[in-house]
């Protein structure tokens, strides 16, 4: 774009008769352009001009008699003076000669001249401050001789850099004030003139004045007001609805100030045409955008303005034979607006590329309209206009030059669009196609292949099938013309040309609509496959349509199946498939595959049953669907974020072989074990089972349990068939539950192939029953007192029996106290409601502290009992026919529904009502989940009815409960309990001495009267197989109290097995008095175990 279009600078002239300006130029360049000029508009708002360029013009360019808009704002006269004689003889006459030229009114226009003359006195000595004229300084002398002209000092030599900066800062402020003052005066003058003109009907003069206002605002960079003035000009022009000729397009287009005439002047001359009007407003609007800060918004605005101008001219002058030439030169001119070094901004690259593409397409249209040259697949609308393109003849002197210029232009545009950060990928592909078609047209087939390789795939994938098909046909033809091209480089990998060609044939089959064309390309595809046997992956969509029935069912024992509807419409005939696979993936990333082999896929609709022998249960999302035909794998990959999921349930089948893993029913206290049971094991030929412990979610670093006590073992394998296996494990963390992954692989005797199952099993490893024990010693009897409670507050326990067995090594113990319930007892967590079970143990021989007894407790949790009752009594209700339908879903019922039920145990305990807690289960979600299964309606309905009943509450009696839970297998906990270690043990008895009357019944005991008793102390160590100690090592003592006075042998040594002595007890209180306490200690003062038979007896004293 020509430089003259940029007019945003304030003109300032200088007259330099002494050739001083060049020494001052660096100083002026330091302060220019002026910055931060504040102008207060008439409405009171303050506008800030951040940057105001100043154009310094030698006085020679300002000598002519000009109007205000052509005159400088300031006129400088630069002089110096070092003596009185020089001032009087040369300087003063020169100033007086210069001043008469500064007329107040233009002689040619009669317009008042508004500018400011300033004398610049150049001095690098003290002459300015010295009094050359005795009483006044040189500056004062200038002021006295020329009072109406401002005189300013300028210099180029300073005492310091700081002085220099301060001096020119002050000078800059004075120039700002002068420029602002002249701007304000000119603005006021023009506005007054316009106001006066609006009173009359002189439209042309009003228009001229508005144009001057616009120019003044532009010069001073007040762009908002300039834009408003331009809009007013346009509004006035349109309002007058002037008749004007079309005019001629300016070829070549000029945007210089010489061609940018005043609109008012043109109207006065009567030469205005439509082209001049379009150009006038375009140039001025573009000028305003040019003066704005060089932001992306300004560039986008300029680009839109240029496009709109081209569109307007194209419509207005569509019949002009010079239209294409005009557009070419116009766009060339406008491209200079976007010339920057090292352009890297994507938006600027995009704008420039768009303009270049407009220029190229216009040029191609001009060439094709005026010559016989053609480009493949490049067409323009037919036109009756015989366009001229003579000025650009050298760009297409022959077809080779034409194609080379087209290629150069396209590559330049392509390079710019490639810098747009992928925003214009479609245009990049289109341009690449055009280059490829040019190569193909020039029989440069290898170059064409390299370009088309990615382009046609883009169009077929974006459903631009018509374009994709054409390019594809050209690509195949180009590749067919390259017999030596065996390998192509695609994304850095080497791919055989045959594979690429096979892929292209499939693309053709996808895009072809008529069957005849499909047959031709299908034959070519089959011939190529027969010759090369290519293996590749290809998208399934476009050739097949897949619809899934998301409900998985059991095809036969150990085989799950899913139904698929497959429509084949991409091939002209039936095709034989080798394999079809549907892959599903769960949240953990595990994949299961349903498949079918050797299936004849008919053209049109097909219904398939895909089977899975290596099954896994849970919720799965669709991963992919594959069909293998003639070595080609057609794949449909499903998106990761999808709402649809497929539930693979565990369906029960009597004939199915599987391995069940659960917590062992019979456990010893402190022991942890699993039970592995092989179902239908007699049908197995081989069996491999892997039990793997999963890390807990709360502690992913460590394993919760190990299968070895000596080392951490997370995996256990079995490689031979079995019926039942007990697998012990050891806790490594404080947990109540953990997860196992059970992987089973097996073959059957009467069925070919390998079967497998992978399932996740949750093991509850906490003990549901809490057992504590106390021991009680008596003279000839020993008691165990067991207290039983539920170990978890939320999980009551049902107790069936409690039996204590003697050690296997002895049979002379007599045990009494076994508990066998007629109606199971309900045990809770509450310690105040413990179930107490006492056992009386006597020994024919001695007790042995090494002997270990076993308490065997048979129990279930209340939830297990209620689950059983709900299943048998509420759900099945003895309906055999319905149970046959339900049986295959009983595993799903147990794992997915029963496990989630939470009962109101308080309601059951108090009123024998089975009812679910409100937070137990969401019936709507459960209903929705069940409907995703291929479950029969009769089964579904009854399950929902059952859940509704239990949600409301069901009253039961003990008889019904006992009857329906007979099939519930009790758990058994064996608690080993050992007799306490040997301690010295004594039996003490107060035996009343014989009198003529029974002292306790026939005589009245009164306070102060003694009562006679024989105290018998027996050492019972013999009952524990220990020798009696007779060395006096134990001391017997009757303890004093405030109730009794002891008379007799109160304290003595125990030296024999049995000792008897007499004491007299004198009561000191009335009422019921307990016998005195006794104590036996060893010589170290430690108390021994004593069985005091009178400890809880009392005597009534009167």
UniProtKB/Swiss-Prot annotation:
Pfam (any one): Ig_TR130_2nd
Any one GO CC term of the record? trans-Golgi network
InterPro entries the record matches? Ig_TR130_2nd, NTS_TR130, TRAPP_II_complex_TRAPPC10_C, TRAPPC10/Trs130, TRAPPC10/Trs130_N
Q: Which GO terms describe its biological process?
A: cytoplasm to vacuole targeting by the Cvt pathway; early endosome to Golgi transport; intra-Golgi vesicle-mediated transport; macroautophagy; retrograde transport, endosome to Golgi
Quote the subcellular location field of this record.
Answer: Golgi apparatus
Principal subcellular localisation of the protein = Golgi
Keywords of this entry: Autophagy, Golgi apparatus, Transport
Q: What else is known?
A: Present with 432 molecules/cell in log phase SD medium.
Q: Which family does it belong to?
A: Belongs to the TMEM1 family.
Q: What role does this protein play? A: Specific subunit of the TRAPP II complex, a highly conserved vesicle tethering complex that functions in the late Golgi as a guanine nucleotide exchange factor (GEF) for the Golgi YPT1 GTPase. TRS130 plays a role in the YPT GEF activity of TRAPP II in concert with the two other TRAPP II-specific subunits TRS65 and TRS120. Required for both the cytoplasm-to-vacuole targeting (Cvt) pathway and starvation-induced autophagy through its role in ATG8 and ATG9 trafficking.
- Can you state the subunit structure given in the record? Part of the multisubunit TRAPP (transport protein particle) II complex composed of BET3, BET5, TRS20, TRS23, TRS31, TRS33, TRS65, TRS120 and TRS130. Interacts with YPT31 and YPT32.
Name of the featured protein: Trafficking protein particle complex II-specific subunit 130
């Amino acid at each position: 774009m020509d430089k003259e279009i940029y007019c945003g600078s304030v003109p300032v002239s200088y007259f330099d008769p002494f050739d001083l300006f060049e020494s001052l130029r660096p100083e002026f360049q330091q302060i220019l352009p002026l910055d931060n000029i504040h102008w207060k508009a008439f409405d009171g708002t303050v506008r800030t001009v951040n940057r105001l360029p100043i154009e310094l013009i030698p006085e020679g360019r300002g000598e002519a008699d000009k109007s205000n808009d052509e005159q400088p704002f300031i006129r400088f006269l630069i002089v110096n003076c070092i003596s009185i004689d020089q001032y009087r003889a040369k300087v003063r006459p020169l100033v007086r000669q210069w001043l008469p030229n500064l007329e107040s009114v233009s002689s040619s226009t009669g317009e008042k001249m508004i500018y400011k003359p300033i004398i610049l006195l150049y001095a690098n000595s003290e002459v300015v401050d010295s009094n050359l004229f005795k009483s006044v300084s040189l500056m004062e002398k200038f002021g006295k001789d020329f009072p109406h002209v401002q005189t300013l000092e300028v210099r180029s030599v300073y005492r310091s850099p700081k002085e220099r900066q301060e001096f020119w800062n002050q000078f800059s402020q004075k120039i700002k004030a002068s420029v602002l003052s002249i701007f304000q005066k000119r603005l006021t003058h023009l506005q007054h003139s316009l106001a006066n003109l609006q009173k009359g009907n002189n439209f042309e003069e009003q228009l001229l004045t508005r144009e001057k206002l616009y120019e003044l605002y532009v010069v001073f960079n007040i762009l908002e007001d300039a834009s408003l003035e331009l809009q007013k000009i346009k509004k006035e022009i349109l309002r007058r609805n002037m008749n004007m000729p079309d005019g001629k397009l300016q070829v070549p287009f000029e945007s210089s100030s010489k061609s940018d005439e005043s609109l008012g002047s043109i109207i006065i001359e009567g030469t205005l045409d439509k082209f001049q009007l379009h150009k006038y407003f375009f140039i001025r609007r573009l000028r305003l955008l040019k003066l704005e800060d060089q932001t992306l918004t300004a560039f986008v605005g300029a680009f839109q303005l240029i496009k709109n101008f081209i569109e307007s001219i194209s419509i207005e002058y569509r019949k002009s034979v010079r239209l294409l030439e005009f557009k070419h030169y116009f766009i060339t001119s406008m491209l200079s607006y976007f010339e920057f070094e090292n352009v890297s901004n994507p938006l600027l690259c995009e704008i420039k590329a768009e303009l270049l593409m407009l220029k190229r397409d216009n040029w191609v249209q001009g060439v094709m309209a005026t010559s016989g040259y053609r480009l493949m697949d490049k067409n323009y609308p037919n036109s009756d206009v015989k366009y001229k393109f003579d000025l650009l003849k050298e760009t297409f002197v022959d077809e080779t030059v034409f194609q080379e210029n087209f290629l150069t232009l396209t590559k330049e545009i392509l390079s710019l669009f490639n810098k747009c950060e992928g925003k214009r990928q479609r245009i990049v592909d289109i341009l690449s196609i055009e280059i490829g078609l040019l190569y193909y047209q020039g029989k440069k087939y290898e170059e064409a292949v390299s370009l088309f390789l990615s382009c046609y795939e883009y169009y077929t994938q974006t459903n631009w099938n018509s374009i994709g098909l054409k390019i594809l046909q050209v690509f195949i033809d180009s590749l067919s013309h390259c017999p030596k091209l065996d390998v192509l480089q695609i994304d850095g990998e080497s791919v055989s040309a045959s594979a690429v060609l096979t892929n292209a044939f499939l693309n053709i089959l996808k895009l072809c609509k008529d069957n005849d064309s499909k047959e031709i390309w299908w034959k070519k595809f089959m011939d190529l496959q027969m010759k090369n046997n290519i293996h590749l992956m290809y998208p399934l969509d476009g050739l097949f349509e897949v619809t899934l029935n998301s409900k998985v069912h059991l095809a036969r024992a150990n085989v799950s199946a899913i139904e698929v509807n497959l429509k084949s419409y991409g091939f002209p005939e039936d095709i034989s498939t080798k394999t079809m696979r549907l892959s599903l993936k769960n949240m953990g990333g595990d994949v299961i595959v349903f498949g079918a082999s050797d299936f004849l896929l008919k053209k049109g609709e097909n219904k398939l049953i895909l089977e899975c022998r290596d099954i896994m249960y849970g919720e799965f999302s669709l991963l992919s669907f594959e069909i293998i035909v003639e070595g080609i794998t057609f794949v449909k990959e499903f998106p990761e974020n999808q709402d649809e999921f497929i539930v693979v349930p565990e369906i029960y089948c009597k004939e199915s072989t599987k391995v069940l893993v659960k917590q062992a029913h019979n456990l010893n206290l402190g022991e942890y074990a699993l039970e592995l049971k092989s179902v239908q094991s007699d049908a197995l030929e081989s069996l491999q089972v892997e039990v793997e412990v999963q890390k807990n979610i709360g502690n992913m670093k460590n394993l919760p349990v190990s299968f070895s006590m000596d080392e951490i073992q997370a995996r256990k394998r079995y490689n031979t068939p079995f019926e039942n296996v007990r697998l012990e494990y050891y806790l490594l963390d404080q947990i109540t539950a953990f997860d196992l992954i059970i992987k089973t692989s097996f073959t059957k005797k009467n069925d070919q192939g390998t079967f497998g199952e992978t399932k996740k099993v949750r093991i509850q490893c906490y003990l549901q029953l809490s057992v504590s024990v106390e021991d009680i010693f008596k003279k000839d009897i020993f008691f165990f007192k067991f207290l039983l409670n539920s170990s978890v507050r939320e999980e009551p326990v049902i107790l069936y029996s409690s039996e204590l067995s003697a050690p296997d090594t002895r049979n002379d113990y007599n045990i009494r106290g076994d508990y066998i319930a007629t109606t199971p007892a309900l045990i809770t967590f509450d310690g105040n409601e413990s179930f107490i079970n006492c056992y009386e143990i006597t020994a024919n021989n001695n007790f042995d502290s090494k002997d270990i007894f076993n308490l065997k407790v048979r129990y279930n949790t209340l939830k297990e009992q209620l689950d059983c009752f709900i299943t048998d009594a509420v759900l099945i209700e003895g309906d055999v026919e319905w149970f046959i339908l339900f049986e295959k879903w009983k595993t799903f019922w147990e794992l997915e529904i029963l496990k989630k039920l939470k009962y109101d145990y308080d309601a059951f305990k108090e009123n024998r009502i089975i009812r679910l807690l409100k937070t137990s289960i969401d019936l709507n979600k459960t209903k929705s989940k069940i409907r995703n299964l291929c479950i029969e309606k009769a089964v579904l309905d009854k399950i929902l009815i059952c859940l509704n009943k239990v949600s409301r509450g069901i009253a039961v009696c003990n008889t019904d409960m006992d009857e329906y839970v007979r099939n519930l297998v009790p758990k058994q906990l064996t608690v080993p309990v050992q007799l306490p270690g040997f301690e010295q043990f004594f039996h003490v008895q107060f035996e009343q001495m014989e009198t003529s009357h029974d002292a306790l019944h026939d005589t009245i005991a009164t306070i102060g009267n003694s009562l006679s008793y024989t105290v018998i102390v027996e050492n019972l160590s013999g009952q524990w197989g220990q020798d009696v100690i007779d060395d006096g090592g134990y001391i017997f003592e009757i303890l004093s109290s405030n109730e009794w006075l002891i008379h007799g042998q109160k304290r003595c040594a125990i030296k024999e097995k049995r000792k008897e002595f007499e004491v007299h007890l004198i009561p000191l209180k009335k009422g019921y008095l307990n016998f005195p306490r006794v104590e036996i200690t060893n010589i170290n003062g430690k108390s021994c175990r004593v069985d005091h038979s009178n400890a809880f007896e009392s005597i009534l004293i009167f």
